[in-house]
Amino acid sequence: MPDVSSPRDVPRDDLQADPPAVDLTTTVVVVLGTPAATRTEDHRALADLVARLTGVTAASVSLSQVCPNCAQPGHGPLRVQLAGAPDGSPTAHVSLARAGGRLALAVTAAGPVGIDLESVAALARAPLADVLLSAAEADAVAALHPRAATAAVTAIWTAKEAVLKAAGVGLRVDPRDLTIAWETPGAPGSDAAHPRLAGWPNAPFLLNELHLMRVATPPEFAATVAVVCARRPRLRLLPNPA
């Protein structure tokens, strides 16, 4: 089971604190905080986090986005460039999500990463089931009581968004092509259940190399992080209480 800190609302000032030493090749680091006024400032906060986790200067870290579909800059997967990094240095992978006045950042060198953060109330108001659920998921959700069904749909949505971000394709892929199952007995989306990618016919990676981890959040939010790598990484939520 991943090492997840207790849910807490992390003030933006905490993003400036020096994080403890962590092996990014075996760990995915997640920070929850408050978004800045602009997307550019949020990207700078993510770049600063990469700098502190990798031990380089902030000036040596830059982020870029180029859409793999239209080849235009300014949108698409976030990529990290480390100026002057030694040959053979692990590649840092990053992801970012915003929802309901909150921000989630993810950094790892284990492999491509995607994170999704959602407002539970906002998703509950949206008619998602018809555009989100595979046939197997729809059957599982239909068997649940309404409150449990809402939690399940929220968990499935954040898991699929995280997977599609890690794959670098986003919502250009129909979410219904993916099927999320649950490793632990319990209702989908419950605290006792852990998601896994059970099906995606055109996945750009082996399904057993996609690792999903639910992130501890305040109760009004839900978050999931996905990492593509051979071995399941450890999840570290910062700031991490001593």
Language-model features: locations:
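Core catalytic alpha/beta fold that binds nucleotide/phospho-ligands
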Residues: 1-242
